[in-house]
């Protein structure tokens, strides 16, 4: 078939727009620093290749880590809604997704108490790391308890589901109020 999806052409332009918008709005050419996840790197490489030819500075990039999906690996994806938390998810849906999330835990509570778990592969632990535990000492302690079998996955899942629902509830309220602005 000799056709292609318009997204192949359109999406790189959308991704590149933040690099050039300042000059378009103000006439001032300033360097751009763009935070993006590693999967966006191909777009920035193309942008860097063409920027100077268009009269702009080459944009710099900062690669950010993904907030992983709730499955056994990879990023959240709208095409896998059961592995993603959406800003408009309702509390019951969030709780169900979190309770079904992949963790670094063992098959049984007894086995996990004996052998510990692996927070490095745990999607729930990543929520503490990225969003819900600002105190490094507390995060390190949670990791130690996890690895040592002192803390079970169910405890973390219950806590994260509650924290997410509070966070999302506040977001949804603000979103509704913003509609009136």
Model-derived features: where do they sit?
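Divalent-metal (Mg2+/Mn2+/Ca2+)-assisted nucleotide/phosphate chemistry catalytic cores
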Residues: 1-64
